Amino acid sequence: MARYTGPVTRKSRRLRVDLVGGDNSFERRPYPPGQAGRARIKESEYLLQLQEKQKAKYTYGVLEKQFRRYYAEANRRPGKTGDNLVILLESRLDNVVYRAGLARTRRQARQLVSHGHFTVNGKKVNVPSFKVSQYDIIDVREKSRSMLWFEEAQEALVDTIVPAWLQVVPSTLRILVHQLPERAQIDIPLQEQLIVELYSK
């Protein structure tokens, strides 16, 4: 599946938000790239809406065509379209692996899932965009548990704080999805209503 593989820090600076988490380069230079990066530019309503969409896309590693599908599904569901959109993105398997502390970044989580290191309810899943459901059980495949990365992650899980809607069992590298997240439980700096306004035009 196509995905953005370019420099994430540059995108973080352009959108003025840390898309990776703990990006030291962004912390040092949180202004847009380029010689005039520090100058304050008057932003139009459209530009603000576009920036929020780009922020969501790059945070979750989703390209435009797939993002439109997420929006269409969010719009069909009952409730607030913006909330639905963020919850759908947050429910991706690669994001759940990241939130559970089994990857340092969403990009790394996407790679681990793509390489077939996880099962969902006992079945191998190598699609990062796979949507988890309430009561799903996600495991690291037995033959993958001896990998150095998972051994190190297992030790770090003791001190890892995971979202309330997830539970991680460090001894078995198991992730339990107790429920799908509510918007208030998702700590990303995103104004999703601006995305709704953009697509509603």
From Swiss-Prot:
CDD domains: S4. Coiled coil: none annotated. GO terms for molecular function: rRNA binding; structural constituent of ribosome. The keyword Ribosomal protein applies. Keywords: Ribonucleoprotein, Ribosomal protein, RNA-binding, rRNA-binding. GO terms for biological process: ribosomal small subunit biogenesis; translation. Residues 91-151 form the S4 RNA-binding domain. The keyword Acetylation does not apply. Part of the 30S ribosomal subunit. Contacts protein S5. The interaction surface between S4 and S5 is involved in control of translational fidelity. HAMAP family: Ribosomal_uS4_B. This is Small ribosomal subunit protein uS4. It comes from Corynebacterium jeikeium (strain K411). The lineage of its organism: Bacteria, Bacillati, Actinomycetota, Actinomycetes, Mycobacteriales. The gene is rpsD.
